[in-house]
Amino acid sequence: MKRFLIGAGVAAVILSGWFIADHQTHSQEMKVAEKMIG
């Protein structure tokens, strides 16, 4: 059970980091698009 919890914790950290990185790149693309349109 402990091993499962550790694995779940590691997976959660990796997923949250991936979501944050994906959101940051997306917001940067939106800023570039706004500059091009504006």
From Swiss-Prot:
One of its GO terms (cellular component) is cytoplasm. Contains a predicted signal peptide cleavage site in the N-terminal region, however the propeptide is probably subject to only one processing event, at the N-terminal end of the mature peptide. It is found in: Secreted; Cytoplasm. InterPro entries: RapG/K_inhib. Induction: Part of the rapG-phrG operon. Transcription of phrG only is controlled by the sigma-H factor. Expression is rapidly induced in the transition state to stationary phase. Keywords: Cytoplasm, Secreted. The keyword Metal-binding does not apply. Disruption phenotype: Disruption of the gene results in the reduction of aprE expression. Signaling molecule involved in the regulation of expression of DegU-controlled genes. Secreted during production, but the mature peptide acts intracellularly, indicating that it needs to be imported into the cell to function. Stimulates the DegU-dependent expression of aprE, an extracellular alkaline protease. Acts by inhibiting RapG activity. At high concentrations, represses the DegS-dependent aprE expression. Belongs to the Phr family. This is RapG inhibitor.
